Amino acid sequence: MLEKTTRMNYLFDFYQSLLTQKQRSYMSLYYLDDLSLGEIAEEFDVSRQAVYDNIKRTEAMLEEYEDKLVLLQKFQERQRLVAKLKQLISEEEHVNEEMKQVVEAIEKLD
C-alpha cells in the first residue's frame, strides 16, 4: 500500500496540471493530506462512493499519462544514474572537477 501511495504521489506531482480542479482537490486531500473517503465526501457534500469513483478514475488517468509520457520513469532513471555517478566519483581519488560540476548540474535539473 505504501508503494502505491508513493507512486500516486509522484504521478500526481508530475501530472496534476492535466487534471480538473475537482480531481486535484480529491487526490490532494486523499493522498497528501491523508483524509478518508468519508471526510472528503463530507467536505464536498457528496457520497463516499462518488469520492471513491473519482479517485479511482483519476488514478487510472495518471497511470495512462505515465504510460504515454513516461516522466516518472525518466525521473527515476535520472536519479539512479546520478547516484551511480556520485558513487563512482567518491571511489575515485582524483576526479576531474569539471565532471563533478556536470553531476551537480544534472542534479539541479530535477
Curated annotation (Swiss-Prot):
Gene3D superfamilies tied to this protein: Winged helix-like DNA-binding domain superfamily/Winged helix DNA-binding domain
Pfam families: UPF0122
Disulphide bridges: none
Domain of life: Bacteria
NCBIfam families: PRK00118.1-4 (NF001068), PRK00118.1-6 (NF001070), YlxM (NF045758)
Function recorded in the entry: Might take part in the signal recognition particle (SRP) pathway. This is inferred from the conservation of its genetic proximity to ftsY/ffh. May be a regulatory protein.
PANTHER family named among the record's database cross-references: UPF0122 PROTEIN CBO2450/CLC_2298 (PTHR40083), UPF0122 PROTEIN YLXM (PTHR40083:SF1)
Family, per entry: Belongs to the UPF0122 family.
Name of the molecule in the record: UPF0122 protein BALH_3477
Source organism of the structure: Bacillus thuringiensis (strain Al Hakam)
